[in-house]
Amino acid sequence: MVESQKAMPQPKMGRIRRIHFVGIGGVGMCGIAEVLLNLGYEVSGSDLKASPVTERLESFGAEIFVGHRAENAATADVLVVSSAINPANPEVATALERRIPVVPRAEMLAELMRYRHGVAVAGTHGKTTTTSLLASVFAAGGLDPTFVIGGRLTAAGTNAQLGTSRYLIAEADESDASFLHLQPMVAVVTNIDADHMATYEGDFNKLKKTFVEFLHNLPFYGLAVMCLDDPVVREILPQVKRPTVTYGFSEEADIRAINVRQQGMQTHFTVLRRDCEPLEVSVNMPGNHNVLNALATIAIATDEGITDEAIIQGLSGFQGVGRRFQVYGELPVEGGSVMLVDDYGHHPTEVAAVIKAVRGGWPSRRLVIVYQPHRYSRTRDLYDDFVQVLGDANVLLLMEVYPAGEEPIPGADSRQLCHSIRQRGKLDPIYIERGAELAPLVKPLLRAGDILICQGAGDVGGLAPQLMKSPLFAGAKQEKSK
């Protein structure tokens, strides 16, 4: 199946010519900016510092400003902002004063989706991986989709790409409820967990109702793809008044996995689909959570008529996403080496899934985790869960909380987490005040065969490459690109 529609209707946003992104280096912003650049719009943007992301956009023709100043927005026809941008930002204030429209990033994404067959992936966990798998399988099926992803797709070298077909595949962000702007043709709900609860006034029922409202943005002929294994998704399923397909390990699911075998980084399983032949597939990712992500992908690909051969190829050829159990390489230690992994997981459910994946794929190896909590509010709200989950590592080093703009909350810091985990009696965590201290602290703790994971959503993401370059680990072997 090959679909190419060069005459695809494109967003003609009236009098809009120049689009300015406030915080253009953000993972949710840069992808939309790149697609708009490729559509021929003038794009400018500002961020607090230059980065490889802003340099990439600049190479495509974007005008990049370092720092936020009123004059940056002076010639814009519209400003795009994320929820992280303060309304007092001078560029936003100038735009409002001059009556220049200021729109959330999700509204701009919705404008792109309006002209395409939109596939929106929602859920507390697994959005980025599922969206990336969909992009890979659709490409293998000859559908050349446009995609906007919250992580760098290894095969494409970017988190966004303008395709030639009618399909647009994107993440749907529930963190600020902005996914309600989207009106896709197909929507996935991977799971629903307690996170970003300030958006929902601490009311979990409100969070559930918002997911149902999101699914009702589908047309009556659309499709809701829902994970039956998640108890909350199962709970809201009867409320969804749209066509649905379910997936999971449950025997009740429309599309389910059996005979799961994990061998290191590879996971093999059999897919059972109603009215279809069983399908033998493999993915280059460990863990049952990634089997579920693959099942969501298979459900949509099957519904869209993508061949089984293309599904198998797209899944087996998937090269992963940046910071989603990304293997950096091998660090030399006495008697052998240590596998170094970088991971974005920052919720107890995500940490638990990674630990389970390691235990399943490498049962005889010790797990050393360097973890950085993300946001004081999340640490406070999920404190007991963090204590329980992090205590399942063999060795644990805790960095101070990455604030993400929040003020400290008493009792919700990493020193207190260390104390609480230590009281459980299973292990004695080590507190790290600064990331620069990691190499000399962690090296004496490592043994040949260990798996070392740097995990979290903050600046812990820079530590794996630093360890690879550290003189203390001279001779480190970089993971070869697949």
From Swiss-Prot:
Keywords: ATP-binding, Cell cycle, Cell division, Cell shape, Cell wall biogenesis/degradation, Cytoplasm, Ligase, Nucleotide-binding, Peptidoglycan synthesis. Pathway: Cell wall biogenesis; peptidoglycan biosynthesis. Its EC number is 6.3.2.8. The keyword Cell division applies. GO terms for cellular component: cytoplasm. GO terms for molecular function: ATP binding; UDP-N-acetylmuramate-L-alanine ligase activity. One of its GO terms (biological process) is cell wall organization. InterPro entries: Mur-like_cat_sf, Mur_ligase_C, Mur_ligase_C_dom_sf, Mur_ligase_cen, Mur_ligase_N, MurCDEF_pg_biosynth, UDP-N-AcMur_Ala_ligase_MurC. Its main location: cytoplasm. It is found in: Cytoplasm. It catalyses: UDP-N-acetyl-alpha-D-muramate + L-alanine + ATP = UDP-N-acetyl-alpha-D-muramoyl-L-alanine + ADP + phosphate + H(+). ATP binds at residues 123-129. Belongs to the MurCDEF family. Cell wall formation. PANTHER family: UDP-N-ACETYLMURAMATE--L-ALANINE LIGASE (PTHR43445:SF3), UDP-N-ACETYLMURAMATE--L-ALANINE LIGASE-RELATED (PTHR43445). This is UDP-N-acetylmuramate--L-alanine ligase. It comes from Pseudomonas putida (strain GB-1). The lineage of its organism: Bacteria, Pseudomonadati, Pseudomonadota, Gammaproteobacteria, Pseudomonadales. The gene is murC.
